[in-house]
Amino acid sequence: MMERERLDEALATLGALLQERGEHFNALVIGGGSLLLLGVVERPTADIDVVGYPSATGYAKADVLPDFLVAAVRDVGDALGLGPAWFNSGPAGLVDFGLPPGLADRVTVRTYGTLEVHLPALEDLVCFKLYAAVDLTERSKHFTDLQALAPSAEQLLQA
């Protein structure tokens, strides 16, 4: 599990390694990692959830991460004791349902070497967390995260 400082360290290490190897990647990140980086929650996260990368039409689905990135993620995971899947595209299928309109205009971009991490605005994270919280109990981390976002009735209806 990674606290905010450890998460920043891992991303900085990954960005520096990509830069050293002459590679770059831009990732749209959701989930607990994005909430932690934005300071919405204090709970640690197990991983970074990548759903997409910038494209000419907004964000494309990141269902398969490029080999150079997978290798760098593995190397950083080994070096920092995070395991090989600490940065993954597990929830990329959310893109198939459609991203919130205007999301690309509202992201916050954090740069770590040649790695850009795109963090959705809180209103967009409400959409993702509402989706994740469906069919789960009030004790789930997704439900707790949704409560931390404190969405308005309008945001919930839009989500």
Can you say where each PLM-predicted feature lies in the sequence?
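Compositionally biased terminal segments of proteins
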Residues: 1-159
